[in-house]
Amino acid sequence: MMKLALSQPPFSGTLLMLVVSILLLWEKAASIPACMVEEGDCWDPLQETFNSAIQRAETLCNLADQLYVEFYQNQFSSRQFADLNSKLIKRDETVLKAGIYCHSTLAKPQTRGGNFEIEEHLKMLINFVGSWISPLFHLVIELSAMEGVPETILCKVKDLEENNRQLLDDLRWILTKVSPTAEIREEFPSWEHLSFLKSSNKNNKFLAMFNLSNCLDNDTKFTLHHLRIFKCLITGKDC
């Protein structure tokens, strides 16, 4: 059984506020059927959707980590990424921004003061995951059109794009079950490096990939961590 450490940085403040909200969550969960009888077994659709979402998030974490490593090691991109990393160390302004700033930060779930609403946090997580829909879609298109792209890289990017879309669908469904009357405005932050990716200049394309691989590696871990917390608090499982 996985233990969720309340002291684990940097999410400790979030976890404490989540715990404060747990009674409200259980009250909402009481309106959701505990399970459905299917072939003699009790099947909980909410728990199963959480399992699906977490499995997809784990897949995204693994793929993002593998893609990050491959960009540095594969002959297709290793020289360009080494050059970009060197410029990052030298604090080149353009590369520094690409290396540390992520567009998804604008949608990142955060707590403000002592107020925390599980419904609002889920909505923010939906927009956070949704912020990767466009970048991954366009990355698949651009890599498919580039010459010399290894199949291993292209396959990973396609799998990332597919799993991210399916994870977003899982989150949307979970929100409708936890808060049936919830209304959400999906506002996915735009990716400012999209123009670099679509540029005819190869250096610009690799700069966009540099930004994407750095941010995606961190964001997938953030998403997985929060999904595990939500499953524990909403379903009472795997705490």
From Swiss-Prot:
Annotated disulfide bonds: 35-42, 102-215, 232-239
GO molecular function annotations of the record: hormone activity; prolactin receptor binding
GO biological process, one term: female pregnancy
One cellular component term from this protein's GO annotations in UniProt: extracellular space
Chief localization: secreted
Signal peptide range in chain numbering: 1-31
Tissue: Placental basal zone cells.
Glycosylation sites per record: 211, 218
InterPro entries xref list: 4_helix_cytokine-like_core, Somatotropin/Prolactin
Cellular compartment(s): Secreted
Annotated SUPFAM superfamilies: 4-helical cytokines
Keywords, sorted A to Z: Disulfide bond, Glycoprotein, Hormone, Secreted, Signal
PANTHER family per the UniProt record, alphabetical: PROLACTIN-8A6-RELATED, SOMATOTROPIN,PROLACTIN
Family in the record: Belongs to the somatotropin/prolactin family.
Name by which UniProt lists this protein: Prolactin-8A4
Organism encoding this protein: Rattus norvegicus (Rat)
Phylogenetic placement of the source organism: Eukaryota, Metazoa, Chordata, Craniata, Vertebrata
Gene: Prl8a4
